[in-house]
UniProtKB/Swiss-Prot annotation:
Keywords: Amino-acid biosynthesis, Aromatic amino acid biosynthesis, NADP, Oxidoreductase. The lineage of its organism: Bacteria, Pseudomonadati, Pseudomonadota, Alphaproteobacteria, Caulobacterales. This is Shikimate dehydrogenase (NADP(+)). Involved in the biosynthesis of the chorismate, which leads to the biosynthesis of aromatic amino acids. Catalyzes the reversible NADPH linked reduction of 3-dehydroshikimate (DHSA) to yield shikimate (SA). The keyword Amino-acid biosynthesis applies. Belongs to the shikimate dehydrogenase family. It catalyses: shikimate + NADP(+) = 3-dehydroshikimate + NADPH + H(+). Shikimate binds at S22, L23, S24, T69, N94, D110, Y227.
């Protein structure tokens, strides 16, 4: 039986459109139950054009904070009263918290999730060991590039079909980042310590990325931010080439950890195997 929600229950959640598929409530509520914390985490689906109104209604302290997903990450950043350096660098917020005085604080934990997943599933990998290639030039790519630069990557190669978009992302972080057209992916992969897919290609049966992963060094790590399916065509190709791989579910869990700390003032309990719970849920949703 779930514990009752009381006047002391700490409420947090995730806001997106759509959001019914989100695994965040499963992850956070499992941690809450394991830790014995009087808290709850729920999903919200605000109208796509009324997110600011939705957030303003929460400034009075109704909830502790929100994780923010598509399509609200950029607007969440724009309406915040205080913006963290991580969110500013990523040009997007995936975490907002509400202060007692009504202020909204914006942060971005995607980079924490990215680096945490790489460290967990590719032990020994280091951001500062060599160039890293990032596929895509959207919000997820911006967050990845910012995190990699902050972690000491000597060069980040942004590979995108539309070169101008890659150039815009590269320009935001300076000379460490370089833009590459998609048809030059093989050159971008040469010598890379990691190749990271920050696009939605391969999600839920959509076409996967057709890129020359065989151009990567044998020691390279290949990561996909997509977690449904867990092993995307991109990761399957990497595994066929005997490259180490990192999946998007691990990133989701790792980026949730600092959010849990911000909402509930505690670290996620080590004994809660939220990955196993999430995998079971994903298997149940498989077509």
């Amino acid at each position: 039986m779930k514990p009752p929600i009381t006047g002391r229950t700490v409420v947090a959640g995730v806001a997106g459109q759509p959001v019914a598929h989100s695994l965040s409530p499963l992850i956070h509520n499992a941690w809450l139950a394991a830790a014995g914390i009087d808290g709850v985490y729920v999903a919200f689906a605000p109208d796509a054009d009324r997110f600011e109104v939705f957030v303003d209604g929460l400034r009075g302290g109704a909830i502790r904070g929100l994780n923010v997903t598509i399509p609200f990450k950029e607007v969440a950043l724009s309406i915040a009263d205080v913006v963290s350096p991580r969110a500013e660098a990523a040009a997007a917020a995936n975490l907002i918290t509400f202060e007692a005085d009504g202020r909204v604080l914006a942060d971005n934990t995607d980079g924490v999730g990215l680096l945490g997943a790489l460290q967990a599933q590719a032990p020994g990998w280091r951001a500062d060991a060599g160039p890293v290639a990032v596929l895509g030039a959207g919000g997820a790519a911006r967050g990845a590039v910012a995190a990699l630069v902050a972690a000491g990557a000597p060069q980040v190669r942004i590979v995108n079909r539309t070169l101008a978009k890659a150039e815009a992302v590269a320009g935001a972080v300076g000379r460490i980042a370089v833009a590459c057209p998609l048809d030059a992916a093989a050159q971008a992969f040469e010598g890379a310590t990691a190749v990271i897919n920050a696009t939605s290609a391969g999600l839920s049966g959509s076409p996967g990325l057709d890129v020359p992963l065989e151009a990567t060094p044998e020691t390279a790590v290949v990561m996909d931010m997509v977690y449904k399916p867990l092993v995307t065509p991109f990761l399957q190709r990497a595994q066929d080439l005997r490259r180490r791989t990192v999946d998007g579910l691990e990133m989701l869990i790792r980026q949730a950890e600092p959010s849990f700390q911000a909402f509930y003032g505690a670290n996620p309990p080590a004994g809660a195997d939220v990955r196993a719970l999430a995998l079971k849920t994903l298997e149940g949703r498989a077509p």
